[in-house]
Structures are given as structure tokens and as C-alpha cells.
Amino acid sequence: MKRKLAKLVLVRHGESVANRDNVYTGWNDVPLSKKGIAQAKNAGLKVEKIAEFAPTHIHTSVLSRAIMTANIIADVCSFLYLPITKTWRLNERHYGALRGINKDVSKKIFGTNQVLEWRRGFDSVPPLLTQPVQDRRYQKYDMRLMPQGESLHQTQERLMPYFWDHIAPELMAGHDQLVVAHGSSLRALIKKIEDISNEDIVKVEVPNAEPIVYTFDTDLHIVKKEILH
């Protein structure tokens, strides 16, 4: 019997209150806005209509906005019975000392070109926090692993071990997977699986709550990609 081609569906969380207020978030934990809740429900309706999509596992971060979105999608799609893994490795890129700052204000403080480089340069690291992350959700981990600010490259490096260990084997076995994460963490993943150059990743945007559907063969080659606007 021929093994089915597996689908990987990536969804960025719905609008958060920080997105609404144009504030850098990173590892700050913020909920969805009312608009974000509606977007998550709509994303669920889109995921529900994906032909022959039957995920065996849901993967998300340990941040509320992604978890809320994953739960809403699971509810809409009747996926609540599925196992869900919440991992810090799928967290948003850590924006260091920029987190909590309004994006327009950051341009006035640091200059537009510098901020653009921090946001879009693959290896550009924002100003670091002066203290490690103090949050109970990370207490069980080796604090030396916890970033105080990250480039997109560093985000990719801490994310990909989880992908190779927990998602890729399932896809290669023909099992569909659903990942609900964040704009920059998903950009880092997309860069790797699509083999996008450092220069071209600057142009890649991942909008809130618009599912991206990849179909893979058993060697993890992309057969088809579709964005559900």
C-alpha cells in the first residue's frame, strides 16, 4: 500500500493585544485581542476544509496567544482529542530589550534603519536583556539555553531540533501535523524547509491566522504549498 503524502499546516496566532498596539512582544506573554479570537476561529474554518487533512498531533509554543489560537482551531475542527505539545522551542523570536516597546517609538530611539536591520536581518541581534528570563514556565530548563535576545538565525537554531526530532519523523511516516506558532519562529522554519536564502527571507511575511499548507513526500520534499487567505 502506497503511503499517503503528509501535510504540514502552519498557522501564526491570531492578532494579540500587542500586535494591536504595535508593540514588540517576543517572549512577553500576551493574550489574543477580540479580533485575534475571531481570526483564530476563521483559521479553524479554513483548516477544517483542507482536503484529507487528519493531523495526529498539534504543536505550539508555551505562549498564551499561540496556545489560545491552537485551542480555538482544535475546537472548530473537532481536534480537541489530539495530543498537543507546548514547547519553548516554538516560541516567538526573543526581541531582547525591544520587547514591550512600541515599534514607532523604537525607530525614534534607535533610528529606522537600525530597527529595520534588527527586525529583518537574518543574523542581526537586538539589544539584549540585562537579566535572564524570570518566568516559571522556563524554570525546569537549563537557564543557559534561555536567550536574552535572538537573531532570526538563532531562533532557527533553537527551533529546528524540535522539528527534526518530533515533526519531521511524523511527516515522513505519512502523518499530518499542525503547528501553531509565531510570525518570526514560523519564518525561521519556512526558511529551512523551503531553503530560502538569507537575503530573500527578508521579504517573507507570515500574516496572523492564515494557514500555510505544505504537502511533503516521504523524503520531506515539498510537493505542494498553498496559503489559505
Swiss-Prot record:
Keyword tags: Gluconeogenesis, Glycolysis, Isomerase
Chain sites annotated for binding substrate: 12-19, 25-26, 65, 92-95, 103, 119-120
GO BP: gluconeogenesis; glycolytic process
Entry's Gene Ontology molecular function annotations: phosphoglycerate mutase activity
Site feature location: Transition state stabilizer: H182
EC number: 5.4.2.11
InterPro entries attached to this UniProt entry: His_Pase_superF_clade-1, His_PPase_superfam, PG/BPGM_mutase_AS, Phosphogly_mut1
Catalyses which reaction(s): (2R)-2-phosphoglycerate = (2R)-3-phosphoglycerate
Pathway in which the depicted protein is active: Carbohydrate degradation; glycolysis; pyruvate from D-glyceraldehyde 3-phosphate: step 3/5
Lineage top rank: taxon: Bacteria
List of catalytic residues: H13, E92
Protein family according to the UniProt entry: Belongs to the phosphoglycerate mutase family. BPG-dependent PGAM subfamily.
Function: Catalyzes the interconversion of 2-phosphoglycerate and 3-phosphoglycerate.
UniProt name for this protein: 2,3-bisphosphoglycerate-dependent phosphoglycerate mutase 2
Organism of derivation: Lactobacillus johnsonii (strain CNCM I-12250 / La1 / NCC 533)
